[in-house]
Amino acid sequence: MENERVEREQSQFQEDEFIDSRKPPPWRKQITVRAIVASLLIGIVYSVICLKLNLTTGLVPNLNISSALLAFVFLKSWTKVLQKAGIATTPFTRQENTIAQTCAVACYSISLAGGFASYLLGLNRRTYEETGVNTEGNNPRGIKEPGVGWMTSFLFVTSFIGLVVLVPLRKVMIIDYKLTYPSGTATAVLINGFHTSKGDKTAKKQIRGFIKSFGLSFFWAFFGWFYSGGEKCGFSQFPTFGLQALDKTFYFDFSMTYVGAGMICSHLVNLSLLFGAILSWGIMWPLIARLKGEWFPATLKDNSMQGLNGYKVFICIALILGDGLYNFVKILFFTGRSFHSRLSKTNSISTLVEVPEDSTKESDNLKRENEVFVRESIPLWMACVGYLFFSLVSIIAIPLMFPQLKWYFVLVAYLLAPSLSFCNAYGAGLTDMNMAYNYGKAALFVMAALAGKNDGVVAGMVACGLIKSIVSVSADLMHDFKTGHLTQTSPRSMLVAQAIGTAIGCVVAPLTFFLFYKAFDVGNQNGEYKAPYAMIYRNMAIIGVQGPSALPKHCLELCYGFFAFAVAANLARDLLPDKPGKWIPLPMAMAVPFLVGGSFAIDMCIGSLVVYVWKKVNRKKADVMVPAVASGLICGDGLWILPSSLLALAKVRPPICMNFTAAH
């Protein structure tokens, strides 16, 4: 379904008679100073947004389309201002737009996938204490406090190797196998659409919509700050459905970030979140809380992993693992079947680069795209030398940072990385699903078990980061190569842009994280910045070390049940006809509110409701404007984080505490 939609969109922009057919500029001229500046600014803003989303719920929508729109807005405005000032400037091309978008995505992807809210943050003392100092397997040797220096070094050591691991196979995967990479194709469709006469008019409407929603969101966040001068104060604690519902986390917290995210995510994701919130906070946790004294000691603290909090964390993990394992096996199956069928074709050589015969224009476009993509190749020796160099650096540096992870474990990880990266990138090209987190979780369990009780927690989480980083970056690069292929952008300039963005991200991400870490109460399970995945990853490592003995009473049986439910739900959605199948909830989305509460699920559903009503009133306008308006809501609220965190660091507190109590 997704692939068919993308192919329809692709054919639409290829049919536009006004599409830019000029010869692409040389690859060095595609990388401009203004594109790097634009990507730096977008990367910083989106790094803040990604970290806020990661540290609050861990659920982050795909922001690639949004970043392409912002890159167009920034560079188009730049060229127009200079032209009005009478300053000569080079034309703004779709290749430059692609470079800016690629560089920006590479930058904020480090904040998104760098482990700041999961496996790296899970090493700190607070998460160790929240997990339970008396929990077997939760060794005090497994503590490493966050630091700008070691985090930046770790990112530089681990983030670049994924850029070179699959470079030799780019032609095979993009041209020969014709993998669609739906997200990369959709981004290319958007960028190509901008650079047409019709697309320019549409872009102006989107820019106006973005500016209005951005202003509204930023002003609302600024206004709401004045009323949040204390714990559980402000509009974020507004008892929309009453005080009892507020205690169960069911309320609208006026977060424009999550309303915007809900507009981007599908209705199924948002409804799955709400279903998970109702099932957990509305039914299960109140029932289990009544069993205090029977299932777990009544004297335990609320945050004890042997009490109610343990059920929240481990059942959430069971859903995540069940969903992840099913999709992992499914993607491997489809990848293997597709790969085998291609290899078994006797006439594969003649059909690999076949050109459509029904449209001369489409045929010419495809020829130009393939020609540009193949002409400016990246030398094989460069990729091999780069992989060996970064592997050697990692094998030396990572055991120095983390003595618990021995050098030979790092060596094994890098020997396995190319094959794992290929499987993941091939699967992502078919399904648009990046399974890097599941490869990382597999590495976590294996390494935690191998390293033993004393070193297992740290070794497991760091190994998870190594594998996930390589596998994720290589798949993202293939998405970018697909975008570059369809916008006739040189692979060399794409790789350089990705490297520049990654380098910027390795500096920006730790600094942005420490803005949150110093200004806000990160890791407080009763606060806004719960960092749920730090707790989840540390507990997964403990399970890897200890096995099921780490779980509270009857929790293992519940985990088995929810693991089976996750597998069954995915199986039902794949096997049932489309009509009933589309209503089966997504276990991965259901799992998030199990730990963090239901308020953000209500925000997301309100975003979904806005999109639903808008499409009922004017579907054509909604299809054009929803991404722009949603991006504005996310960026406005996200940008307010910068001044609010600086005020918090300066000890400037909001003047008013608005909260609500019962009248009697």
From Swiss-Prot:
Q: How does it sit in the membrane?
A: Multi-pass membrane protein
Question: Any idea what a deletion of this gene does?
Answer: No visible phenotype.
The protein's matches in InterPro entries, at most eight in alphabetical order, are given as: OPT, YSL-like
Which keywords, in A-to-Z order, does the entry hold?
Cell membrane, Ion transport, Iron, Iron transport, Membrane, Transmembrane, Transmembrane helix, Transport
Location, primary (coarse class): membrane
Q: Which GO terms describe its molecular function?
A: oligopeptide transmembrane transporter activity
Protein name according to UniProt: Metal-nicotianamine transporter YSL2
Q: Upper lineage ranks?
A: Eukaryota, Viridiplantae, Streptophyta, Embryophyta, Tracheophyta
